[in-house]
């Protein structure tokens, strides 16, 4: 029996030791985004995400040398922020291929437009603000930049807090306000909030659950699309289209998006594309988008017959469908 107690004590001590060993040191710049999120959650801090290309971008290297890597900046900003830098210098292509690919995926998911690029995130990874720094920025101008963003960041944090407490109606309203504040290209990062919304509004009493179901479909499809899993990306919208909560026009848009994704991927599965577009048309034949869908169906039929251009479903046509969907 004593041996069992000793063994149990050793196991407890081992677990405690391992747990301590896993604590992430956030007193300086991190280079792992997952570690940054864990540290931010554990320490209740914001995340300052900095995308750079030190070896190939003069602005990135100057900002690091004169501001971000200085002791004063790190000391001042690690009190409230977990600092994370994902760098895309050429030398990494030779030594860190796997991590570089993961970092590039994060760059794409956050719709980063250029190098360098700066975001303030919540511990969950939600975008609270975009920042901009001049090449000659110093600590004083950094204080101004962060200070100007503070009202926007604080408002986001207040809304995020409201999603966790209060009545269901108050929480749902806070989630919708966060979506309204977030750039459409970044709402896929809000997937956990969409899941929360749907769990709080199971009977769609708000009439807005379909928006969050659609957002979740886009989020999952984006992940699959980036992995080259086109069929799985299309399947997300096909699954969405079958949800009874959606209006006829929303169902139409879901089937259309599945078809468009497949067509734009270069797939030659024209019958499957046609099937998606036919289901889209049938879902709401009286909608404003229906006439455009009939044109798509004719174009795809020509491709099936070997008479059409494989790129016939154009970006202009896609924009037309999306505009009509928004107007509805």
Kindly label every feature range from the protein language model.
Residues 134-211, 215:
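Thiol-/selenol-based redox modules, centered on thioredoxin-like
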Residues 27-31, 53, 69-101:
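Thiol-based oxidoreductase modules, predominantly thioredoxin-like and allied folds used
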Residues 18-19:
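C-terminal motif of bacterial Sec signal peptides marking the signal peptidase cleavage site
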């Amino acid at each position: 029996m004593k041996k069992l107690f000793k063994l149990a004590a050793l196991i407890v001590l081992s677990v405690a030791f391992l747990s301590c060993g896993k604590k992430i040191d956030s007193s300086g710049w991190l280079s792992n985004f997952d570690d940054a999120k864990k540290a931010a959650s554990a320490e209740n801090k914001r995340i300052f995400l900095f995308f750079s290309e030190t070896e190939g971008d003069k602005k990135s290297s100057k900002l690091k040398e004169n501001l971000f890597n200085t002791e004063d900046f790190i000391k001042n900003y690690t009190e409230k922020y977990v600092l994370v830098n994902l760098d895309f210098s050429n030398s990494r292509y030779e030594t860190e291929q796997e991590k570089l690919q993961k970092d590039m995926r994060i760059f794409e998911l956050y719709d980063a437009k250029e190098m360098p690029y700066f975001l303030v995130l919540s511990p969950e990874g939600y975008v609270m603000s975009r920042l901009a720094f001049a090449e000659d920025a110093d600590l004083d101008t950094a204080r101004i930049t962060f200070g100007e963003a503070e009202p926007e960041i604080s408002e986001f944090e207040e809304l995020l807090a409201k999603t966790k407490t209060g009545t269901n109606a108050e929480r749902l309203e806070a989630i919708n306000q966060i979506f309204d504040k977030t750039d459409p290209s970044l709402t896929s990062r809000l997937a956990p909030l969409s899941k929360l919304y749907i769990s709080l509004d199971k009977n769609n009493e708000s009439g807005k659950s379909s928006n969050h179901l659609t957002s979740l479909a886009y989020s999952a499809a984006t992940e699959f699309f980036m992995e080259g899993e086109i069929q799985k990306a299309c399947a997300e919208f096909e699954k969405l289209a079958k949800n009874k909560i959606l209006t006829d026009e929303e169902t139409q848009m879901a089937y259309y998006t599945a078809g468009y994704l497949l067509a734009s991927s270069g797939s030659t599965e024209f019958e499957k594309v046609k099937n998606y577009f036919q289901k889209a048309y049938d879902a709401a034949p009286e909608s404003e988008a229906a006439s455009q869908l009939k044109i798509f169906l004719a174009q795809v039929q020509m491709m099936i017959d070997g008479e059409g251009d494989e790129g016939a479903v154009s970006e202009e046509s896609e924009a037309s469908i999306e505009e009509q969907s928004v107007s509805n």
